[in-house]
Amino acid sequence: MIVENNKQLKKFLKDFKSKESIILPIEQDSNLHPQKSKLSLLYVNTFDDEYVLPINHNECLNIDLPNLKTKNKVYTLDRKKLLHFLDLDNVIDVSMMSYMRTGKVLELDNLNTTAHDFLNMKFYKKKNINTVIPVLKHIEKCRKISTMLQNNIEKYSEYVNVSYNDEILNNLSFIEKNGLMTTEGKVFSEYNLYTSTGRPSNRFGGINFAALNKKDGSRKKFISRFKNGVLVEMDFDAYHLRLIADKINYEFPKGSVHEHMAQFYGVDYEEAKRLSFQYLYGYIPEDVIQINPYFSKVHDYIEGLWNIYKNDDFVESDIYKRRIYKENLLDMNANKLFNYTIQLMETENNMKVLSALIPEIREYKSKLILYSYDSFLLDFNIEDGLDYLMKVKNILEQDKKYPVKVSWGLNYHDMEDITEKFV
């Protein structure tokens, strides 16, 4: 049913509010970030009936989007995308559900109709193309997606990881919605969790936000959206070394991790830093295992992790209990598995700290605009005061367990270290 009047809307809402459903948003322009596009249609399948709510389409009598809050489960292809358009609870991301078990991204390549392909190719410059693609063709495509989702729900519903589905996707959606201001206007990032290690990639519109070059000046265009604002970056110090230390119960003394390591190697700070990361991500020589108690414990941990992986056919993360299955990984060895585990530890610790941070900063004017592996970027409104920055720093550091360095600047290229201001 295409819902075009109040009578049809009442029937739909009565049915929708009493059942679980699949919801698929159809934006006006699929080439734009969801924050820059608007809804054209909303496809809803209650497993018994299907409905299409026309919000902005040339063929229909359009309606205002109703309140769709429900206590029932709502399944969708992409929870993060749906939350850009609708404020809903109990939304289950079927793509994530399936990925948690199979390690594979759902195949979406053959879901377009010939009308979608033809019109997108012929009118590739036209904005809001979905508003002129026939509604019946949108329904045809949505039926294919809905069938695929139902098949995956039947197979993998027991593998829903609530922490990933709710907590992590909500955190990333929060950052995405804030956007980043540039000298050319606001741009938006898009995090992708479908990576072998679980560490999100982050790119949209030709920009790889997870790998912005620090040296070529490409960061210079990122500025504050506020007249009295600056960008502030908080960067974890020796993050991976400290994460693993926590895992293996090794306590670093106060101060610099690399100066501590230099004492074992008999080298200067920079060389100690280079060697520690070389050993952490690669081969640990026998003499280092003998002289360095940290890497002795790391070596034992790697061997233990490898044995668990071989015996159980999976390893499980500490924080969110995500399983990485042997059958989904290729050409694995002990060190490669350890590297995957480090990245998963990093990601999940970051998500845990975001879950603590976001409720505390939501009401401030300043915006959290980027998270990248071991750093967090804030668009800081001076009116929020240094107390705001101190609050963020304290939450990130988790009782001083993971010290952060702080820098700020009028743009993301020219950043000045101000860590000493917070000592």
PLM regions with names:
Residues 1-109:
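Conserved RNase H-like, two-metal-ion catalytic cores of nucleic-acid enzymes
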Residues 283-288, 298-343, 379, 383-423:
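C-terminal polymerase-core module
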Residues 160-170:
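Acidic two-metal-ion nuclease catalytic site recognized across multiple nuclease folds
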Residues 83-85, 89, 93-155, 168-178, ...:
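Helical catalytic core of nucleic-acid polymerases
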Residues 88-91, 368, 404-406:
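Generic structural signal for residues in well-ordered beta-strands
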Residues 73-75, 123, 364-369:
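Short secondary-structure junctions
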Residues 148-160, 360-368:
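Surface-exposed helix-capping loop/turn segments at secondary-structure junctions
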Residues 2-3, 18, 28-48, 55-58, ...:
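Acidic, glycine-rich two-metal-ion catalytic cores of nucleic acid-processing enzymes
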